[in-house]
């Protein structure tokens, strides 16, 4: 539901699934969806020294969408191949982490499918920082130290294994308040072993932001979206299952085709994913190159796929049909044997693993001498003769080999991709190139090729090879012109200035798109274009290869079957993408440039004002507040249950107050959601008990911690309701009216810990202005005290200083930034003058009651002090006694004071201890309305 993705409104029931499109309409009016600069990063976009890394509108949108002010916990970034998803994630992390020491996340965690992608991501981050701050006098050591302390990288599988070995408590303590980025998030499938571990880990974190990067969120079925949805949910109760998805979120209709069922999204599908997605298709339409799909369209019933066909040799045809004639129980459901044969049949008629073991070296992945001789057909033969001989075993490999060699000799780079490496796969094609005289490695230009697979290269070697291949000097293949790649380069890798891309058939189009996108992406052909001498765009040629058998035209080979299956799946996926785009968040500035009209979505920003930022700032709460919880609860136990009354007393709130539980919830909820606290306790409010657990598994089974009261005007003020409702509850006189009637003082909030007073008061005052329907500041001043000075900020600072004491310093609200800052020295005299005026007024009130003394109560320690009423306004005095603790007065003096206010102390022979006398004095002064709260009870405060 949208409310799970956009928790903008306090709710009474967490299981309610109410939702409306109007909520998303309101959200998109804010600057996060319209601003062209990063809102909260300290970096100015104009400082960029490298224009190629200047953020684009769709990247800024995501970065601003996940700021500390935003209530959004996570988003699926479905941006097409080549749109700069890596930089999008980098900007989002920086925009959040650098937004403020007490607001943003503490660290970034990047999880990638493999180490090659991880190194590529890390290099992009390093390059961005060095380019970004090259004029900030930061050396490499300073940058490396900052990055190593702030950003952590790991592969998905390695981190999942770490999660499985680590307790929940340790994981929460170590990783709470983390900005998590999962690259190629579609690799986390429901059937995989890593998904439940990563999903459980994210559920542990009470404070986190999550970005899931993917260009192809669905590979085979629409239900591939299930893990992406669940990874964003903070509670497991909000997760959905594949069965629920297929039942409620899509309609399924069996096709006459042999490939797959037709799936269509429902309205419930839109509701589930609204607000969770940022959608942007691939930017090939506006790329600087023209994409040419080589081959024929419409072959073998394929409607959209352009393929290059290769007719089987006689040996391949016989082997292929013999392999397909076996019993079904003996067949691989993925037709792996047929796929191997379509690639290559070895000279002895074997294929796949059997032929590889005979003709290839298992340790090195290189061909045996015997195999090379067989491929060459003898010594002294020409290239044409070798290719003709290779065609007996694989017409496809012979055709591709000739194509890439001819291209290399023209100064054009090529990429050949295959998901099968051993068997009849990529390493056998490498053997064909070696038979033609090419060498593995680099340095010989058109005579060199690289084989980027984990079977023959380490990850560092692959990263180094990619740098050489992408280097400016290698734009025309001067060092190496041909690159062979497996799944290790299928995602998250950039191949620059590739002119020819050769790919094989896949069971889904998503993998094919990912592979093609390695060489066609943003700025991928910048060097080629810089050297281009024509007004026409350079061409990039894409070859989708398929092996057929012209001898049996009524039989479709496995390659044709795979392409047909991909087309059928593409229909379903395109329908789901259109549905996602209709409820996706898009920035207005990117619509005309990147997003096709059908994909622009119905929600774009409008009504932009300078004040249009999401109005959610967490109160300034520090760990000292949590320290008090530690004193009350013994967290060494697995579970702790304490009565609500005990917790209320901890905060000096009267348990008999009608509104005490309401205030308690506001405080506890604020603590739970604050990103900088590392609260590793799980709090549940249920009736008259507060349960706290260190075990999140048990906490998951408990009801969600929600407002224990019904809010009014929830839909009247839109986004402001969350903020204003909280502010209203904080400053409302009714919140503790029952508890405060007997005191006669103006201090309901002063009974809370000082740091909480400051944070809640600052939040309340920050809501002042035309968008404050509750008139928060004026109500606060009216309730807590008035002043003749018309400056609201100064009055707020005076009240805050009076409440928290001089040691906390004076703080005022900066009307331009909307944040609280230390009081400028020029304003300190005004604050002190007003503070003295307030104290003088208090003294005069006591004189009007004909009292010589009044009581002072410390809000946190509950110490009771007695202060003498001065006959003159306490000004121009170096030091004023704020009041001694009552129990430190002499017995005779206490009896005298008690008699002055009408307390019977008995005759001179009666004996009463000082504690009893102090209790009687406090009770009497409370009846007279002569007890105030002050944190300076029992100490001296110097005044200059």
Curated annotation (Swiss-Prot):
Source domain of life is: Viruses
Domain spans labelled Helicase C-terminal: 451-523
- For this UniProt record, give its keywords in alphabetical order, as a comma-separated list: ATP-binding, Helicase, Hydrolase, Nucleotide-binding
Give binding positions for ATP: 79-86
Q: Which SMART domains match?
A: DEXDc (SM00487)
DEAH box, short sequence motif: residues: 183-186
Which terms does the record give in the GO molecular function aspect? ATP binding; ATP hydrolysis activity; nucleic acid binding; RNA helicase activity
Q: Which residues form the Helicase ATP-binding domain?
A: 66-235
Reaction(s) catalysed by this chain's protein? ATP + H2O = ADP + phosphate + H(+)
Family statement drawn from the similarity comment of this UniProt entry:
Belongs to the DEAD box helicase family. DEAH subfamily.
Instruction: Give the protein name, as stated in the record.
Output: Putative ATP-dependent RNA helicase
């Amino acid at each position: 539901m949208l409310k799970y993705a956009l928790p903008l409104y306090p709710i009474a029931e967490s299981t309610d699934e109410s939702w409306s499109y109007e909520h998303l309409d309101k959200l998109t009016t804010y600057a996060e969806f319209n601003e062209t600069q990063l809102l909260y990063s300290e970096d100015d976009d104009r400082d960029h020294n490298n224009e190629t890394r200047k953020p684009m509108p769709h990247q800024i949108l995501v970065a601003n969408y996940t700021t500390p002010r935003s209530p959004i916990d996570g988003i699926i970034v479905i941006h097409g191949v080549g749109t700069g998803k890596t930089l999008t994630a980098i900007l989002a992390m920086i925009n959040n982490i650098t937004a403020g020491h007490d607001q943003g996340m503490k660290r970034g965690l990047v999880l990638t499918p493999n180490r090659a992608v991880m190194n590529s991501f890390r290099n992009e981050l390093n390059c961005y920082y060095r380019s970004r701050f090259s004029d900030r006098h930061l050396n490499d050591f300073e940058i490396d130290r900052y990055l190593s302390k702030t950003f952590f990288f790991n592969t998905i599988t390695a981190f999942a294994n770490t999660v499985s070995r680590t307790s929940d408590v340790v994981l929460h303590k170590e990783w709470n308040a983390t900005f998590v980025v999962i690259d190629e998030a579609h690799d986390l499938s429901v059937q995989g072993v890593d998904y439940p571990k990563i999903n459980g880990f994210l559920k542990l974190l009470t404070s986190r932001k999550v970005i899931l990067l993917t260009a192809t969120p669905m590979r085979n079925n629409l239900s591939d979206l299930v893990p992406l949805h669940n990874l964003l949910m903070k509670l497991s109760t909000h997760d959905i299952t594949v069965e629920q998805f297929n039942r409620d979120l899509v309609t399924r209709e069996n096709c006459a085709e042999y490939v797959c069922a037709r799936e269509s999204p429902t309205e419930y599908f839109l509701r589930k994913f609204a607000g969770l997605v940022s959608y942007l298709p691939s930017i090939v339409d506006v790329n600087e190159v023209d994409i040419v799909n080589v081959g024929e369209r419409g072959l073998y019933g394929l409607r959209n796929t352009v393929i290059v066909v290769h007719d089987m040799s006689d040996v391949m045809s016989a082997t292929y049909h013999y392999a397909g004639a076996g019993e079904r129980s003996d067949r691989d459901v993925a037709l792996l044997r047929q796929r191997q044969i379509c690639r290559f049949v070895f000279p002895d008629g074997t294929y796949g693993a059997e032929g590889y073991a005979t003709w290839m070296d298992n340790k090195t992945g290189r061909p045996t001498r015997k195999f090379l001789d067989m491929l060459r057909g003898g010594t002294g033969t020409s290239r044409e003769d070798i290719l003709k001989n290779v065609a007996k075993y694989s017409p496809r490999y012979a055709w591709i080999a000739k194509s890439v060699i001819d291209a290399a000799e023209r100064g054009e780079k090529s990429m050949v991709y295959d998901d099968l490496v051993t068997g009849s796969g990529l390493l056998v094609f490498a053997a064909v190139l070696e038979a033609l005289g090419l060498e593995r490695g680099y340095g010989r230009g058109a005579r060199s090729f690289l084989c980027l697979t984990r079977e023959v290269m380490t990850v560092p070697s692959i990263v180094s090879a990619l740098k050489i291949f992408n280097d400016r000097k290698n734009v025309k293949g001067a060092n190496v012109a041909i690159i062979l790649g497996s799944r290790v380069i299928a995602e998250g890798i950039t191949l620059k200035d590739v002119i020819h891309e050769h790919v094989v058939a896949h069971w889904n189009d998503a993998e094919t798109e990912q592979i093609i996108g390695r060489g066609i992406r943003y700025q991928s052909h910048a060097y080629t274009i810089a050297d281009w001498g024509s007004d026409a765009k350079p061409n990039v040629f894409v070859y989708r290869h398929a092996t057929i058998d012209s001898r049996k035209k009524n039989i479709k080979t496995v390659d044709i079957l795979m392409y047909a299956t991909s087309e059928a799946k593409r229909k379903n996926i395109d329908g789901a993408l259109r549905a996602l785009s209709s409820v996706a968040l898009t920035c207005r500035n990117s619509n005309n440039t990147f997003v096709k009209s059908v994909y622009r979505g119905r929600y774009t920003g409008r009504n932009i004002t300078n004040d249009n930022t999401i109005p959610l700032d967490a109160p300034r709460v520090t760990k000292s507040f949590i320290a008090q919880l530690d004193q009350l609860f013994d967290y060494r136990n697995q579970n702790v249950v304490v009565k609500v009354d005990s917790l209320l007393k901890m905060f000096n709130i009267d348990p008999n107050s009608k509104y005490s539980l309401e205030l308690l919830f506001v405080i506890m909820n604020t603590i739970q959601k604050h990103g900088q606290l590392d609260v590793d306790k799980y709090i549940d409010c249920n009736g008259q008990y507060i349960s706290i657990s260190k075990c999140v598994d048990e906490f998951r089974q408990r009801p969600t911690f929600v407002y224990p009261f019904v809010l009014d005007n929830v839909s009247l003020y839109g986004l402001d309701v969350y903020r204003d409702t909280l502010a209203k509850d904080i400053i409302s006189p009714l919140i503790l009216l029952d508890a405060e009637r007997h005191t006669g003082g103006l201090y309901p909030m002063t009974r809370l810990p000082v740091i909480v007073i400051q944070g809640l008061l600052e939040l309340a005052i920050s809501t002042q202005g035309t968008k404050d329907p509750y008139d928060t500041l004026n109500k606060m001043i009216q309730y807590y005290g008035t002043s003749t000075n018309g400056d609201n900020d100064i009055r707020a600072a005076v009240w805050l200083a009076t409440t928290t004491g001089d040691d906390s310093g004076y703080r005022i609200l900066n009307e331009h930034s909307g944040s609280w800052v230390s009081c400028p020295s020029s304003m300190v005299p005004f604050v002190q003058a007003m503070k003295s005026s307030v104290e003088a007024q208090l003294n005069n009130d006591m004189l009007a009651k004909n009292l010589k003394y009044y009581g002072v109560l410390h809000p946190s320690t509950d110490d009771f002090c007695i202060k003498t009423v001065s006959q003159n306004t306490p000004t121009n005095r170096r030091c004023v006694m704020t009041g001694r603790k009552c129990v430190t007065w002499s017995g005779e003096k206490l009896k005298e004071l008690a008699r002055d206010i009408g307390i019977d102390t008995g005759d001179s022979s009666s004996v009463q201890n000082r504690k009893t006398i102090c209790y009687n004095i406090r009770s009497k002064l409370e009846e007279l309305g002569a007890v105030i709260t002050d944190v300076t009870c029992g100490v001296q405060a110097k005044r200059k």
